[in-house]
Amino acid sequence: TPGSQPQPMDLRVGQRPTVEPPPEPALLTLQHPQRLHRHLFLAGLQQQQRSAEPMRLSMDPPLPELQGGQQEQELRQLLNKDKSKRSAVASSVVKQKLAEVILKKQQAALERTVHPSSPSIPYRTLEPLDTEGAARSVLSSFLPPVPSLPTEPPEHFPLRKTVSEPNLKLRYKPKKSLERRKNPLLRKESAPPSLRRRPAETLGDSSPSSSSTPASGCSSPNDSEHGPNPALGSEADG
């Protein structure tokens, strides 16, 4: 071209950068409508997306209802299954319920640690049941009525006498007296009667009969009671 300046020669050794040739005017005229068409296409797509957003938002609320229906269907299937055919894979509903139970237990444990004195489970007060009245009514329905006994006993029905404590003491007193040890100084009942001694005679009164018969001085009470002394009888005869 007449207006172009001469470019210096590149004397560098190695890989040379590629130099794009300047675009020709014919190519520029062809690229302009393509760019315009592309711009219009992108603008149409953006408008379609904006118009589709309200429709998508209007269709979003039914999704939870569909999920609830699916959960109910899964629960029914689990209930209708036999125990032998139940699978070990837990469904999403079961997992959710397990997570809720675990969270409740963790919260209860935290409350116990924070407030140990307060009871974790509120107990309700139970009223006392009238078991005696119910038992009596049931027994009265099965058993025949018992005639009421009179308060005062009749004359032909004597009361049984019981042994009182003083009577027992009197009954056992003789046994205690028998068991006692007797006095050893007392004379036995089985022993023979004691011999009676004659009174001492005066010194001046000394008879030959008394000296000749020494046995006459000591006489047994049995001899004096039953009969005369044989020695005295012989002296009288002589």
Curated annotation (Swiss-Prot):
Free-text description of this protein's post-translational modifications in UniProt: May be phosphorylated by CaMK1. Phosphorylated by the PKC kinases PKN1 and PKN2, impairing nuclear import. Phosphorylation at Ser-164 by MARK2, MARK3 and PRKD1 promotes interaction with 14-3-3 proteins and export from the nucleus. Phosphorylation at Ser-164 is a prerequisite for phosphorylation at Ser-190.
First-tier enzyme category under EC: hydrolase
EC assignment: 3.5.1.98, 3.5.1.-
Amino acid composition bias (Low complexity), ranges on this chain: 206-221
Stretches for region Disordered: 1-26, 47-72, 145-238
Family under the similarity heading: Belongs to the histone deacetylase family. HD type 2 subfamily.
Name the UniProt record assigns to this protein: Histone deacetylase 7
Native species: Rattus norvegicus
Taxonomy of the source species: Eukaryota, Metazoa, Chordata, Craniata, Vertebrata
